[in-house]
């Protein structure tokens, strides 16, 4: 036999059939286990071993010479020892030494030990004398031809697979199943030759089958098995085996339910194992009685319990799951077939094919294990039956092992068909990558599923054009197919796609957008007539670069396809004239190059983003890594408010160009979007295929620093952390966002927003707009004409002012609903929500002047105007007068009077403006010397600061 075996299952199979036996069988199990372990290194043949100096007498009738002749006829090597070059197995049973040996060269039958055994253990015709047993070895070539005949089972299994794959009719399926059963019958007959029970029943059954179309060959085989006497064993065995074939066909039925298939597994176990157990056990118990041995209940129970150990319905449930997997894959595949991809259907074909093989081999192994277990258990305590039990166990174990090895070949046969179909498809489609075609189909299906949502994005995002970029990431089905077909070197980790939408219509984006994942280019500058656009990264976009894979063998059946990435260090983003919004938080910038045992990132690499925005009022939401932004023309904002990528530290005090900032961030330990490399595993029987691929995941990391460079940026929005902003000498616009932020406008006319949190804001020099937002904020205006804003729900703010013509706007409160009172040196203003705005040291200078002789005021800590939501206002002078009048608190009636007077003044202004317009219109109808032209226009009392106040209200 030229087939190299892997007998890892032999040791397990023999061990499982012997563990329930007693006494000497324990030592037999140890011996065979050791032998099986040795044979794992590679048994290649059957060897009849004859020691160098062993003498035997051909005339003694012991049959050894016949055995040698039988081996030679079968082409089995007869090895006469020239040295100690064959490692023999250890003790098998007490008085039996090295009858059956398993070595690294092959399966060794020890001629002298077999000879001694046959001479020593002579029994009556019930079991056959040693001479007749030896004669049977030579005539029927029992043990040797039994091992060889298993090849028939392998071929039959492949025939069954082919029949199922070709969807043949039920008769052909039945024939293939019975051919498989027939091969098993031959193996059993050869393995238990001393059971003289098959002849008449098998012959009769064979004659009947000869009359059935398509089954004549099987009938011939059954009919012509001769040399056996009448007994009641045969029909039970045959019926059990046929039930097994039927169950195997049920397991192979792609339309059968899981419950039905699991039931078929139990049926197989009950019918095959049950009938065989009954027949074999009853026969051997009868032989024990004939030999004068015990046939008590415990012996029968031992036989039954040992056989029960060989039954594993769970294995059939596993097979049923395989067919269910095939069925679900086929259903899943239907949609993608319509999109031009049949990979899922190929996977279903593989699962169905290998499931058929599993069903066939499991049926055979179940029967073999039951027979071996029954014979071994029946032999307990009987020296006479020991050699038969040993040989039956050994040979059935070898058969099972050969089947398992052959099953791998059959699995590979199915996998090769898948491989060939993929290669043929690529050949017929101009060399296109089959697996890339799979990603294309996945993308198209996703696009179809989400089209309604995508078509509504123009409205939702308020953009004339929406650019949607979708990254199809690793697909496990595609990975399975690549591994099974041995084409892992061709598979991709994924593929990126781009779509465009305008006015609720889907456009082909290839002429509008350039997306090059290999070079790292995203160009959306061709905006056409669109004035606004939104660039949406629907799924995490993997880092740019190209992939290359290399498949290497790491073990006998183990392979790994290594991933090599030629990375590009940055994404280059180019925008045009439209006002665009980019959300970069879904662009993967962090690469986990080293992970610990818990999958935490301990070493990273970064891919930066370089964005050139062009014209338009653009918004950029920054992601997890280094970002360089040139805002170009227009009012451009950079947002750090999405994601969780560390607090900002901005120091622009030394910047020489307006809109230039360096933003430092420290991202504390936690989870962040990373690109990592993982391994996909696909199994083809014993063959294990590992394929490395990259994908995005929120990985835990130890923290990292990153630095952003901003140019021509008009406004920066902070994070949810505690940010620090230090402005330039130019006009800055900062929004702290959430967190406890520290914002210093420095020079320039700055717009400073605290956002949520208890912020500290200093306007510095210049006419600043300061909005503390929610939280208890500390606000300082500094020099210049500053505007402060407070809203209901903003909390309790404290304001410090020194110089300039400053204003405080309560943008959603009526002035007369506020409460003004003096608390120590401070003015405290309370709104209807009992939130307080404290203007520090409002009364300090005046009190010093009252108490200190000749004191000259050096500071003005007051706010010159306090304004309500409708523009009504009260001046600092009016506040002082009414506080003094009310003895520390402004009376509500006095405050209402101030508001009413302002409203009257406002109406007067409106009337004055209307009169101006009327006079201007009338003058067009008069001559230049008309006396009406000398009417004096009333002096406008409109405060030039109103435009600033209106801005404050709008804010």
Curated annotation (Swiss-Prot):
Protein name: Leukotoxin
Membrane topology category: Multi-pass membrane protein
Stretches that traverse the bilayer: 232-252, 299-319, 361-381, 383-403
GO biological process, one term: killing of cells of another organism
Main subcellular location of this protein, as a coarse class: secreted
Family membership noted in the UniProt record: Belongs to the RTX prokaryotic toxin (TC 1.C.11) family.
Species of origin: Bibersteinia trehalosi (Pasteurella trehalosi)
Coiled-coil parts of chain: none
Superkingdom assignment: Bacteria
GO molecular function, one term: calcium ion binding
Note: The lktCABD operon has a complex mosaic structure that has been derived by extensive inter- and intraspecies horizontal DNA transfer and intragenic recombination events.
């Amino acid at each position: 036999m030229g087939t190299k075996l892997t007998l890892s299952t032999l040791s397990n199979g023999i061990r499982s059939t012997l563990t329930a036996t007693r006494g000497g069988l324990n030592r037999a199990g140890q011996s065979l286990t050791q032998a099986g372990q040795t044979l794992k290194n590679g048994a290649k043949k059957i060897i009849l071993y004859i020691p160098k100096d062993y003498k035997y007498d051909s005339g003694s009738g012991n049959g050894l010479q016949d055995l040698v002749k039988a081996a030679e006829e079968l082409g089995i090597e007869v090895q006469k020892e020239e040295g100690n070059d064959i490692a023999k197995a250890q003790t098998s049973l007490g008085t039996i030494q090295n009858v059956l040996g398993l070595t690294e060269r092959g399966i060794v039958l020890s001629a002298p030990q077999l000879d001694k055994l046959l001479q020593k253990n002579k029994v009556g015709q019930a079991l056959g004398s040693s001479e007749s047993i030896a004669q049977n070895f030579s005539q029927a070539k029992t043990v040797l031809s039994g091992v060889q005949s298993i090849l028939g089972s392998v071929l039959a299994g492949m025939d069954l697979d082919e029949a199922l794959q070709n969807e043949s009719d039920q008769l052909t399926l039945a024939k293939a199943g019975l051919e498989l059963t027939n091969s098993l019958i031959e193996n059993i007959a050869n393995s238990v030759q001393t059971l003289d029970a098959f002849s008449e029943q098998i012959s009769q059954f064979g004659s009947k089958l000869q009359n059935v179309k398509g089954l004549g060959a099987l009938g011939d085989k059954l009919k012509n098995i001769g040399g056996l006497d009448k007994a009641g064993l045969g029909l039970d065995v045959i019926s059990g085996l046929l039930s097994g074939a039927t169950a195997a066909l049920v397991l192979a039925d792609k339309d059968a339910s899981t419950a039905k298939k699991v039931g078929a597994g139990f049926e197989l176990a009950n019918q095959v194992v049950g009938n065989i157990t009954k027949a074999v056990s009853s026969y051997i118990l009868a032989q024990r009685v004939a030999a004068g041995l015990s046939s008590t209940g415990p012996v029968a129970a031992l036989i039954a319990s040992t056989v029960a150990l060989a039954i594993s319905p769970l294995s059939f449930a596993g097979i049923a799951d395989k067919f269910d997997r095939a069925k679900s894959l086929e259903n899943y595949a239907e949609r993608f077939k319509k999109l031009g991809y049949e990979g899922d259907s190929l996977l279903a074909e593989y699962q169905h094919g290998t499931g058929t093989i599993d069903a066939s081999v499991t049926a055979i192994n179940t029967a073999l294990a039951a027979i071996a277990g029954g014979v071994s258990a029946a032999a307990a305590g009987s020296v006479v039956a020991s050699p038969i039990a040993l040989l039956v166990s050994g040979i059935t174990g070898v058969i099972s092992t050969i089947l398992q090895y052959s099953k791998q070949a059959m699995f590979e046969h199915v996998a090769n068909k898948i491989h060939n179909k993929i290669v043929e498809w690529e050949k017929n489609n101009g060399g296109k990558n089959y697996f890339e075609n799979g990603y294309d189909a996945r993308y198209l299906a996703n696009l179809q599923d989400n089209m309604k949502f995508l078509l509504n994005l123009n409205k939702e995002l308020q953009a004339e054009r929406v650019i949607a970029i979708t990254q199809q990431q690793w697909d496990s089905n595609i990975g399975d197919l690549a591994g099974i077909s041995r084409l892992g070197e061709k598979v991709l980790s994924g593929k990126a796609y781009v779509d465009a939408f305008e006015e609720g219509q889907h456009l082909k984006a290839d002429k509008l957008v350039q997306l090059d994942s290999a070079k790292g280019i995203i160009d959306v500058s061709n905006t056409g007539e669109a004035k606004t656009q939104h660039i949406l990264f629907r799924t995490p976009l993997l880092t740019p670069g190209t992939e290359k894979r290399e498949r290497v063998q790491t073990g006998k059946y183990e392979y790994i396809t290594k991933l090599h990435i030629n990375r590009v260090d940055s994404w280059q983003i180019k925008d045009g004239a439209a006002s665009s919004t980019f959300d970069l938080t879904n662009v993967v910038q962090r690469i986990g190059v080293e992970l610990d045992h818990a999958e935490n990132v301990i070493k990273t690499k970064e891919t930066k983003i370089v964005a050139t925005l062009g014209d338009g009022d653009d918004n950029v939401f920054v992601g997890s890594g280094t970002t360089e932004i040139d805002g170009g023309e227009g009012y451009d904002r950079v947002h750090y408010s999405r994601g969780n990528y560390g607090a900002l530290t901005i120091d622009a005090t030394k910047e020489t160009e307006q809109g230039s900032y360096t933003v430092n961030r420290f991202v504390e330990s936690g989870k962040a979007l990373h690109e990592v490399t993982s391994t996909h595993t696909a199994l083809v029987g014993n063959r294990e295929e590992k394929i490395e691929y990259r994908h995005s995941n929120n990985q835990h990391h130890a923290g990292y620093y990153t630095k952003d460079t901003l140019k021509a940026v008009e406004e920066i929005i902070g994070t949810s952390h505690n940010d620090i902003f230090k402005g330039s000498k130019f006009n800055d616009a900062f929004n702290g966002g959430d967190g406890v932020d520290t914002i210093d406008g420095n020079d320039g006319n700055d717009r400073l927003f605290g956002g949520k949190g208890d912020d500290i804001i200093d306007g510095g020099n210049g006419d600043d707009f300061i909005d503390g937002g929610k939280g208890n904020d500390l606000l300082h205006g500094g020099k210049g004409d500053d505007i402060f804003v407070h809203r209901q729900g903003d909390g309790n703010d404290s304001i410090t002012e020194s110089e300039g013509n400053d204003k405080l706007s309560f943008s959603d409160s009526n002035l007369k609903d506020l409460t003004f009172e003096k608390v120590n040196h401070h003015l405290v203003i309370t709104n209807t929500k009992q939130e307080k705005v404290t203007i520090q040291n409002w009364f300090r200078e005046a009190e010093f002047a009252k108490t200190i002789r000749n004191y000259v005021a050096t500071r003005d800590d007051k706010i010159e105007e306090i304004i309500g939501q409708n523009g009504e206002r009260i001046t600092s002078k009016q506040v002082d007068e009414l506080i003094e009048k009310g003895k520390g608190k402004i009376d509500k009636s006095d405050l209402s009077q101030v508001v009413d007077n302002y409203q009257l003044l406002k109406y007067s202004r409106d009337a004055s403006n209307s009169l101006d317009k009327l006079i201007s219109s009338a003058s067009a109808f008069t001559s230049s010397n008309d006396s009406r032209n000398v009417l004096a226009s009333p002096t406008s009392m409109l405060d030039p600061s109103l435009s600033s106040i209106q801005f404050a209200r709008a804010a």
